[in-house]
């Protein structure tokens, strides 16, 4: 079995009665005009390789199917909520993903849909998987800076640079790190809040390592 993941980018503009398709799918298609909601849907399928092509699924087929059957589902949800002045919650986003799943489920021939992951912004996603689409996975990236030391006093200076390369420095050196944190939540869990999630990650991890010496400050 092989896995194929394809990103389909599109924009929804609730401020205009009719959207514009556009011609640059790399940026987003539909393209949106002015201020729009930019979304990126990652479609993951698993299956065997087609004998004649070596493909699991032709990626252009994924693009066409998502834009034909799924973009309109997001468009309808966003515009309807905008017209009513209503908030779109994570649970509602997950329900839209499940609607998309039901539409896409039989569209890829012998390949099976295994995951849908919606990128809400470059650092935040919500996903459902084939094991149980009634469960959702919320992920967010966090950044921190820290230093550590790669130097062994038992080695000669030459040996340290041979082993640790340019990171070799008895005084230590620093990096910027990005860590992704994912939580699994059941359908109907209306108590999950992004701000609470971020608060926990900040208190239990980021505050312990950010701008710290990992060799000295972190047990």
Question: Locations of the language-model features?
Answer:
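Charge-rich, low-complexity N-terminal segments
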Residues: 1-219
